[in-house]
């Protein structure tokens, strides 16, 4: 759900996730007159629950190993490109057949960089309604300063309800609430969808991330953040509109900067170098394995060296505009949906197109002034790095002044109107060809260039890299079997650990924090900015039990995408909800260190306590506790 995880916590379709996972939907439900992000929200009755604009909840119901079917599509003598195409055609075929047969969203997912392929099938729900959200000041107490740090005091929790045929979904499988939560050294588990890790990548790939991809991403994020902050200063309403974007980019900047700094640490690179040396050493013990697999490490290294210049150019050839994103999405949706599955671009099967249409027709508000700020930041960076004479930007502007061109295509576009987008999609290619909207005309023009560029990328780099990675994965299986877990890929995973503190900054971090610490931190920062407590906290201060545990840390191995994962005990009862990792966890994209890598959770006791004593949401607390 919106890039995060969640769990059913009642028999009536109630889903628990993080506020920072749900805040995009909360913002879409907000207006200048009713800012739900700032004020919070609670629906005491079903009829008061607010339907989200474009939130999907996908529930995994089935998974099947289909490695033999996918690899069987590749025959002897195929080139790397032909092999990649053959596997993609087989994947498209299976996804279409399984979706048609079962009615479920069906995704073929690669594990071990192509070593295994599995079919994952999901029941998808799109009628999802907001039930409860605290005010941002409680959910994100401490702001970006405290993000990815510990100790923490955050009420980063939101509840939605899934509806089926207009009624709350009867969820027979759900987590029950623990009485008493967890204590230090208790065993805990987390089930969620970690987005992606790079632990099985070669040393060459990790060096490429350190030297090229991560610095470029950080630069883009910083440029965008600067533009958003400048825009937000123009008015209170501008600040409200920019807030969610700022939150997302600030979060990304801190996460990616943590990964980058981890890779600049010689100790991290020494660990990765030793892991690869040990692996290669195992291969070298067999002449047969050496002859068959060692060359692929060199192939990855050579491919990345050849790709450096191309990567740089591709990184600065994009238009970071929501309006243009709608336009290109509509052009691609219309073009690809007319083709047989086998002839479509990767990622445009029937199931994907259905989700794509759902997003393209979302009634969520689109703010053109925000879009201009974001778009100009990207354009200015792109032409600053490549110049307006670059072949991509030359096609975009066709001699026009870049800023005037941007203002014109955004101001004169109707794609901020959901009804207009829906009519365009329903009108098919004829509607597109007759459309005078400048964003659509730009998308039709650039689509041809982008398809050619993407094809060159797939044929000359992606297919060859995929071939090498799959061969390295074969060698890893022959030596280690399944003893090493696959990198994260946003499929459901289970991790376990202990509720446990750790040493940091010459002292110790406790296993859990309490409400006492929240007041101390607020007062220490003058009760201002991100450290100002919500009014309700002060109003009820004298009646609260400040010993109530609030947040805690565990040794569970998580990564981005795990946000919203339920934290459960050995009896599969809720003891918390994951909302973050500490600063030491950020290098966990590449290596996991149990001594200091920690997952942060909101304590289940505090969730119930806050609902009853701070938010007058006793009915919701009763539902969670089965009362």
Model-derived features: where do they sit?
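Terminal presequence/propeptide segments associated with secretion/organelle targeting
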Residues: 1-627
């Amino acid at each position: 759900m919106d890039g995060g995880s969640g769990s059913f916590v009642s028999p009536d379709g109630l889903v628990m996730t993080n506020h920072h996972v749900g805040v995009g939907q909360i913002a879409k439900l907000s207006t200048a007159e009713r800012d739900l992000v700032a004020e919070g929200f609670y629906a005491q009755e079903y009829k008061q629950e607010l339907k989200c604009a474009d939130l999907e909840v996908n529930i995994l119901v089935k998974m099947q190993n289909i490695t033999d079917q996918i690899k069987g599509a590749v025959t002897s003598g195929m080139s790397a490109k032909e092999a990649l195409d053959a596997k993609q055609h087989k994947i498209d075929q299976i996804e279409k057949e399984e979706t048609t047969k079962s009615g479920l969203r069906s995704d073929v997912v690669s594990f071990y960089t192509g070593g295994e392929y599995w079919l994952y099938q999901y029941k998808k729900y799109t009628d999802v309604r907001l039930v409860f959200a605290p005010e941002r000041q409680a959910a994100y107490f401490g702001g970006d300063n405290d993000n990815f740090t510990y100790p923490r005091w955050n009420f980063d929790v939101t509840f939605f309800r899934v509806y089926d045929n207009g009624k709350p979904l009867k969820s027979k499988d759900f987590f029950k609430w623990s009485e008493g939560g967890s204590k230090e050294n208790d065993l805990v588990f987390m089930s969620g969808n970690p987005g992606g890790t790079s632990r099985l990548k070669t040393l060459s790939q990790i060096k490429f991330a350190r030297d090229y991809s991560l610095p470029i991403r950080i630069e883009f994020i910083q440029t965008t953040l600067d533009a958003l902050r400048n825009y937000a200063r123009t008015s209170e309403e501008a600040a409200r509109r920019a807030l969610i974007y700022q939150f997302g980019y600030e979060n990304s900047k801190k996460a990616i900067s943590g990964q980058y700094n981890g890779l600049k640490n010689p100790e991290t690179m020494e660990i990765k170098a030793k892991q690869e040396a040990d692996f290669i050493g195992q291969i070298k013990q067999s002449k047969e394995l050496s002859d068959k697999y060692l060359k692929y490490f060199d192939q990855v290294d050579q491919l990345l060296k050849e790709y450096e210049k191309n990567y740089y150019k591709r990184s600065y050839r994009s238009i970071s505009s929501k309006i243009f994103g709608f336009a290109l999405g509509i052009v691609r949706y219309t073009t690809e949906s007319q083709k047989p599955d086998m002839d479509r671009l990767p990622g445009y099967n029937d199931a994907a197109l259905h989700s794509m249409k759902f997003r393209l027709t979302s009634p969520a508000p689109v703010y053109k002034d925000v879009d201009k700020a974001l778009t100009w930041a990207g354009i200015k960076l792109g032409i600053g790095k490549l110049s307006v004479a670059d072949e991509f930007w030359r096609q975009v502007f066709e001699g026009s002044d870049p800023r005037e061109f941007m203002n014109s295509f955004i101001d004169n576009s109707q794609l901020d109107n959901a009804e207009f987008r829906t009519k365009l999609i329903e009108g098919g290619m004829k509607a597109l060809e007759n459309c005078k909207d400048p964003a659509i005309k730009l998308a039709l023009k650039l689509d041809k260039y982008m398809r050619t560029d993407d094809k060159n990328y797939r044929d000359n780099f992606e297919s060859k890299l995929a071939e090498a990675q799959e061969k390295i994965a074969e060698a890893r299986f022959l030596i280690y079997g399944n003893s090493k877990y696959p990198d994260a890929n946003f499929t459901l995973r289970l991790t376990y650990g202990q509720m446990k503190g750790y040493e940091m900054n010459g002292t110790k971090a406790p296993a859990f924090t309490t409400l006492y610490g929240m007041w101390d931190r607020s007062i220490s920062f003058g009760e201002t900015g991100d450290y100002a407590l919500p009014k309700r906290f002060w109003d009820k201060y004298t009646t609260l039990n400040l010993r109530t545990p609030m947040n805690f840390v565990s040794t569970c191995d998580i990564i981005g995408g795990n946000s919203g994962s339920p934290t459960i005990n050995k009896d599969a009862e809720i003891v918390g909800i994951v909302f973050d990792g500490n600063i030491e966890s950020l290098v966990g994209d590449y290596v996991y260190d149990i001594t200091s890598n920690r997952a942060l959770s909101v304590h289940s006791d505090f969730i119930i306590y806050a609902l009853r004593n701070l938010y007058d949401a006793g009915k919701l607390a009763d539902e969670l506790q089965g009362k």
